[in-house]
């Protein structure tokens, strides 16, 4: 009998080498059961601070804490063996100084066992990215629309329509690449600019509301699965519609309980003969 084939976990270096090759498949994951389902199909799983909105009902990602990210990072690591797992650095955990960023990123790496961290920001964060990378922490960048800065940009909207925005996003992506990030998310950016940046920089771009020309794509899993119902961004395609199925299952369960059809004989334990 031949031994089972063991797939090694993908590393940030492997992800970086996928630039211009096979598109990078990425989704968010927050829990062990879902991570197990996604792991065989994804190159990179992102433990995103979007969990604040899709799991906890927050209005934005700003209230997500480092402890929350570590707890969910641990859960995702328990459910994966193949995908590269990256954990978001939440708002306030890295912006103060590069030393603060290293201290908190090191804690994330140590306590979760993840493969790297993601942080938002462009030119203003390049020094921090370089500081982390030089100290052994792989960094996944994030430019374009940055949800942690939603209060300063006037809400969730696409960027790159004016010359100032185009120049800023282009410079941001170049700065993050030059600082040593292994890849960069481009979010909510007009298609021609995302396409241009992908050709311009030498690390993979992972698009979300960007361009099919990006080196990979990422979506929030709850959006992709049709579980998150509060709103649907234009860039989301629902590959399933699980929310109605969950509701229907709960309705059927409630009906059977109230009618005393559940549990049935096959779901209960009988007494042993002679007991």
UniProtKB/Swiss-Prot annotation:
Its main location: cytoplasm. Keywords: Cytoplasm, Magnesium, Metal-binding, Pantothenate biosynthesis, Transferase. One of its GO terms (molecular function) is 3-methyl-2-oxobutanoate hydroxymethyltransferase activity. It comes from the Bacteria. The active site is at residue 187. Mg(2+) binds at residues 49, 88, 120. The keyword Nucleotide-binding does not apply. It catalyses: 3-methyl-2-oxobutanoate + (6R)-5,10-methylene-5,6,7,8-tetrahydrofolate + H2O = 2-dehydropantoate + (6S)-5,6,7,8-tetrahydrofolate. 3-methyl-2-oxobutanoate binds at residues 49-50, 88, 118. It is found in: Cytoplasm. Pathway: Cofactor biosynthesis; (R)-pantothenate biosynthesis; (R)-pantoate from 3-methyl-2-oxobutanoate: step 1/2. Binds 1 Mg(2+) ion per subunit. GO terms for biological process: pantothenate biosynthetic process. Its EC number is 2.1.2.11. The keyword Ligase does not apply. Its cofactor is Mg(2+). GO terms for cellular component: cytoplasm. Catalyzes the reversible reaction in which hydroxymethyl group from 5,10-methylenetetrahydrofolate is transferred onto alpha-ketoisovalerate to form ketopantoate. Homodecamer; pentamer of dimers. Belongs to the PanB family. This is 3-methyl-2-oxobutanoate hydroxymethyltransferase. It comes from Brucella suis (strain ATCC 23445 / NCTC 10510).
């Amino acid at each position: 009998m031949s031994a089972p084939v063991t797939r090694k976990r993908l590393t940030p270096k492997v992800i970086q080498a996928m630039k211009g090759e096979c598109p990078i498949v990425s989704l968010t994951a927050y829990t062990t059961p879902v991570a197990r389902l996604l792991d065989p199909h994804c190159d990179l799983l992102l433990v995103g601070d979007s969990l604040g909105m899709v799991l906890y009902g927050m209005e934005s990602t700003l209230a997500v804490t480092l402890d929350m990210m570590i707890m969910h990072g641990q859960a995702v690591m328990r459910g994966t063996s193949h995908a590269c797992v990256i954990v978001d650095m939440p708002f306030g955990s890295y912006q103060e100084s590069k030393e603060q960023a290293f201290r908190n990123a090191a804690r994330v790496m140590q306590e979760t066992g993840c493969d790297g961290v993601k942080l938002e920001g462009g030119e203003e964060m390049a020094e921090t990215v370089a500081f982390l990378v030089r100290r052994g922490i792989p960094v996944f960048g994030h430019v374009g629309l940055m949800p942690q800065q939603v209060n300063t940009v006037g809400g969730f909207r696409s960027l790159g329509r004016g010359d100032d925005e185009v120049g800023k996003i282009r410079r941001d992506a170049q700065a993050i690449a030059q600082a040593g990030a292994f890849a960069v998310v481009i979010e909510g950016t007009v298609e021609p600019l995302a396409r241009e940046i992908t050709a311009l920089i030498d690390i993979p771009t992972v698009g979300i509301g960007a361009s099919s020309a990006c080196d990979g794509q990422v979506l929030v899993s709850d959006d992709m699965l049709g579980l998150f119902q509060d709103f649907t961004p234009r860039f989301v395609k629902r590959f399933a519609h699980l929310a109605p199925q969950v509701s229907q299952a709960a309705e059927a369960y409630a009906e059977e309980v109230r009618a005393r059809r559940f549990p049935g004989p096959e779901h209960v334990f009988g007494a042993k003969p002679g007991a």
